[in-house]
Structure formats: structure tokens, C-alpha cells
A protein has these predicted regions:
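Classical protein tyrosine phosphatase
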Residues: 257
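Extended, charged/glycine-rich binding lobes that contact polyanionic ligands
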Residues: 1-246, 250, 260-270
Length: 270
């Protein structure tokens, strides 16, 4: 990971020591690293305890892989997969219900903040929500967009839509300014939104302005670049193989989504 340190203490950096972290490739820059600057991520991943036959077939499948569906990974939906449910409550202005769910899944200090505010302002659930970290609330509402994106993409692929065609490489990230696509894709988009019991205007949450979502687009299919795959003896599991993968993905694309095409990993609920 590339990081930036504002006005660094050079001596402290020189003496930095941690058993699992090393610092290298130092250089001065005029600006700090911010959201939006990232071009992509390079991954090196080891998957262990694989049967020899499976290791060969899986590695061959990975080498032949091309584009894959750009689904949001399960981590987007929270530790228990609960974020879209809470996000929908916020969009539907069910502020008390949303606050209860957030409090139940929050550390003690956040619960105390909520309880302290409500003790002084009974029934002001909206006010209590506004005192929570913006980033946390944004993640919750963004998860609704992500869930809808995944459902649209999955149904579109099931119905044989071709996302390699020019002008049809994206799926919507729904918001109050969304323009649905023409044809079958647009029908799917509107059907999925209706099935989630949501409208475009639900995303125009005036009560919490920083949660208003205009909408956007996201690539439907992406490619893993700089891909290398190696099968080797697994030194930790006698008699088994390990697969060592290296690949680069664009910003915002999940390594777990790529890997799920080849490996049966447990979900957070499991």
C-alpha cells in the first residue's frame, strides 16, 4: 500500500519497526494521497490446502480467465451483511429503526453517544443519526447501491446481455438523477429497483444532505492484469498443494470477487 505522511519526522520513520510492516520506496510529493487518486491494486495471494488434481484444474482455469463480473464483494455489506437493510431504512426515512440497528451493531462508545444524545433529546432520532460519523452512514447507504448493482448485473448476465458492446459496458449505481438504459437492461434496472421497494427519489434524502445519492455508473466486466499463477507444495499442509497468484485490479474492484470465480470461500455468515 502507498501511504502519505504529512510533515513527517524523518528520525521516527528511520527508527520505525514492526514485525508485520516494512516501509520502503520513500519520496517527497506536493500533495497527500486522497480518495480518487488510486489507479489500482496489485495483489499477491496464497491459497493453501488444495488437492493436487484440484490445484491443476483451478490454476488452468485461472490462466484462461479473461473478463469477470465486477460484483461488489461481501465486505461491502458489513460484517453480518446487514448494511443494505439499514441503508434502506435510512432511505425510507425510518430513522428510529435505522438507529436501533446501528446501535446494536456498534462499539460501546458509539452506543453511549447515541444514548447520551437521546437522553437529552428524546425521540430526536434524526438528530442522533446526524451525530454519527459521516463515513459510517455513507458506507451503509452506498451498500444499497451496491446490492442493487449486483442484482442488476447478475440478472442481466443470466439473460445473456453482452457487456462487451460499445456503449453498454456499464451498469448503473442508482441515485435520484439516474437515467435508465434503453432496452432489456433498462427493464431489468427498473424491475430490480421495484423489487427492492425503492424509487429514484428515495435516494434524494433531504433530511441528511450528505447522504443524497445522485447515482453513477460502474463497469460491468473487468479484467485481472499482470496475472501469474504458480502451483507448489504446501509447506503448512503436508500432502497438499498451494496456489500462488499475483494480479492487478483497477481501483474499486474486489480481489475476493475475482477469486470467487475459482474458489469456494466461506461467506461472513459462515
Amino acid at each position: 500500500q502507498r501511504i502519505s505522511i504529512f510533515r513527517p519526522d524523518i528520525e521516527k520513520i528511520k527508527s520505525f519497526s514492526h514485525p508485520k510492516i516494512s516501509l520502503s520506496n520513500f519520496k517527497w510529493e506536493k500533495r497527500k494521497i486522497k480518495i480518487g487518486y488510486l489507479e489500482g491494486n496489485h495483489f499477491k495471494i496464497v491459497v493453501r490446502d488444495i488437492d493436487k488434481k484440484d490445484a491443476i484444474s483451478i490454476s488452468n482455469k485461472i490462466r484462461k480467465s479473461n473478463f469477470f463480473p465486477n460484483y461488489f464483494g461481501s465486505q461491502r455489506f458489513g460484517r453480518l451483511g446487514n448494511n443494505p437493510k439499514v441503508g434502506k431504512m435510512l432511505l425510507k426515512k425510518q430513522f428510529e429503526k435505522a438507529l436501533i440497528e446501528i446501535a446494536n451493531d456498534s462499539p460501546p462508545r458509539v452506543k453511549e453517544r447515541i444514548e447520551d444524545y437521546l437522553s437529552k433529546n428524546p425521540k430526536d432520532f434524526l438528530g442522533a443519526l446526524k451525530r454519527l460519523p459521516r463515513k459510517n452512514l455513507l458506507i451503509i447507504v452506498n451498500s444499497v447501491q451496491s446490492k442493487i448493482f449486483n442484482e442488476i448485473l447478475e440478472r442481466a448476465l443470466d439473460e445473456g446481455l453482452d457487456f462487451t458492446k460499445k456503449g453498454q459496458e456499464n451498469c448503473i449505481l442508482v441515485g435520484y438523477k439516474t437515467n435508465f438504459y434503453d432496452g432489456n437492461l433498462g427493464i431489468i434496472e427498473q424491475d430490480i429497483l421495484k423489487e427492492n421497494d425503492l424509487t429514484l427519489q428515495d435516494f434524494n434524502l433531504q433530511e441528511i444532505p450528505f447522504l443524497r445519492m445522485k447515482g453513477g455508473y460502474r463497469k460491468a466486466l473487468v479484467e485481472a492484469k499482470d496475472l501469474s499463477v504458480e502451483v507448489a507444495e504446501d509447506e503448512e499442509f503436508s500432502g497438499s498443494k498451494k496456489i500462488i497468484l499475483e494480479f492487478t485490479l483497477p481501483s474499486g474492484v474486489y480481489a475476493t470477487t475475482f477469486l470467487n470465480n475459482f474458489f469456494d470461500f466461506p461467506t461472513p455468515e459462515q
